[in-house]
């Protein structure tokens, strides 16, 4: 997993509350067991005017001109600004996969569904919680200022607006450590690789009948 320390990027505003995981990545695209290939179908039912199908050539599909991610001013956005209860619905891990592959490094919202919140951290996507008042102000500023960018500092736990105002956010210490060091579940396990190998060696020596060479 790629480490997250600091990020400065363009903000895209998704002004909808209770965005569920089926809206983030519709169910018909969940057949793949790989974690790649979901970015083109992020918010599929909102981004396109037709009904998307797995393995379809998305470059030929008609775009919805009213959807925010299709607006020219938000092309290349890497910070998603959202409303409350983002990521509600089913527990599909494909949702943070799709967001990350599209290009988002962080999400800012007043609240998240618990499972989506946890899955995001495990996949290197930083879900930041700010107050509704701060989020409201960000929506207004993004709308009024094309090219609006934010600076995120995970170590300092801050979001800095273009006007210099600093917004602080809370994060669990263990999750922060994992993001700063790029550690997912596999990475955490590999930190104990030497101890695991030692146990396996001792176990094999003490109970050799359990093993087939």
From Swiss-Prot:
GO cellular component, one term: 3-isopropylmalate dehydratase complex
Key words, A-Z: Amino-acid biosynthesis, Branched-chain amino acid biosynthesis, Leucine biosynthesis, Lyase
Enzyme type, top EC level: lyase
Enzyme Commission code(s) on record: 4.2.1.33
CDD domains xref list: IPMI_Swivel (cd01577)
A GO molecular-function annotation: 3-isopropylmalate dehydratase activity
Catalytic activity: (2R,3S)-3-isopropylmalate = (2S)-2-isopropylmalate
Pathway terms, separated by semicolons: Amino-acid biosynthesis; L-leucine biosynthesis; L-leucine from 3-methyl-2-oxobutanoate: step 2/4
GO biological process entries: L-leucine biosynthetic process
Binding partners and assembly: Heterodimer of LeuC and LeuD.
Matching HAMAP family: LeuD_type1
Record-stated family: Belongs to the LeuD family. LeuD type 1 subfamily.
Record's function text: Catalyzes the isomerization between 2-isopropylmalate and 3-isopropylmalate, via the formation of 2-isopropylmaleate.
Name of this chain's protein: 3-isopropylmalate dehydratase small subunit
